Amino acid sequence: MRRILEKLHILKPIDFNSVEYLRRRGIKIGENVDILNSKLDGSHGFLITIGSNVTITNAVLLTHDASTKKPLGYSKVGRINIGDNVFIGHSAIILPGTTIGSNVIVGAGCVVAQDIPDNSVVIGNPSRILCRYDEYISTQKFKMDTCPVYHTLYSKKSDAEKEQMYLELKNSMGFDL
């Protein structure tokens, strides 16, 4: 009986971060998108557009601001547009009425309340531009020549590899798959 119910999708858990589920909620999503433990405003999902090659990690995207609901009887609403090749870091909050351009990194904990131009790395609350995306990537490529680089996927590392990594990263950072 359980297998029948699972086939009918009655007992299957709902993955609220699956691209398939979010598309059904009206969110426009490009290709190669990873949404990890994030909250996307499903009440106005049709106002969210996400480009291709985007990663969203433990972030919140809000298309509405209910601060005016009780005094005015209405919530403020606005679109959220996210370009291509974007990384949104842990605990970032994207507020309504904002556009994030292409080739952008939004740092962890960042609050995005205004548009972010293409080719930007932003940090802070409120968000501010730290540097250009291409400069950031160039700097990180240079660091890969002087820092430890680990070629085994983190979930496939042996205990010995984990210990080696632990020791090598005592006072520095490195790069992992």
Residue ranges and their predicted role:
Residues 1-85, 92-94, 102, 118, ...:
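Domain-scale signature associated with acetyltransferase and cell-envelope carbohydrate enzymes
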Residues 78, 108-111, 121:
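Hydrophobic alpha-helical segments of small multi-pass membrane proteins
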Residues 87, 105, 121-122:
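Short-chain dehydrogenase/reductase
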Residues 92-105, 110-114:
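Beta-rich strand-turn-strand
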